[in-house]
Amino acid sequence: MEGEGRREDGDCSYLCIPFNSIRDIFQSFFTRFRGLTPDNSPVTISQEVEEETEVVNIPRSVVSGNVAARKGKQQTSSGKGGGTN
């Protein structure tokens, strides 16, 4: 009976993962669970910077006007390849 992970021709069929990938995976888990940044310094509330985003409401008439202008500029295809559609 042959060992697990071996083929009949003698070659191993084990999965090979580079060490750097394993190290990066473990580092991301440790930093997430311990509340540390990737450079291993603790995160405090005073150091966190909130990014502000501005929400702008655009009237529907402005949006539909732009779509109508684009539809008028479309060219019909001649049916030949390589042309402008």
UniProtKB/Swiss-Prot annotation:
Renumbered residue ranges of the record's region Disordered: 66-85
Gene Ontology terms describing biological process: innate immune response
Membrane-spanning intervals of the chain: none
InterPro entries named among the record's database cross-references: PEP
Site (Required for ligand-receptor interaction): 79
Chain positions listed as propeptide in the UniProt record: 1-62
Taxonomy, superkingdom: Eukaryota
Keywords from the UniProt entry: Plant defense
Record has Protein transport as a keyword: no
Keyword field contains Cell wall biogenesis/degradation: no
Family: Belongs to the brassicaceae elicitor peptide family.
General function of this protein: Elicitor of plant defense.
Protein name in UniProt: Elicitor peptide 7
The organism's taxonomic lineage, starting at the top: Eukaryota, Viridiplantae, Streptophyta, Embryophyta, Tracheophyta
Gene name as annotated: PEP7
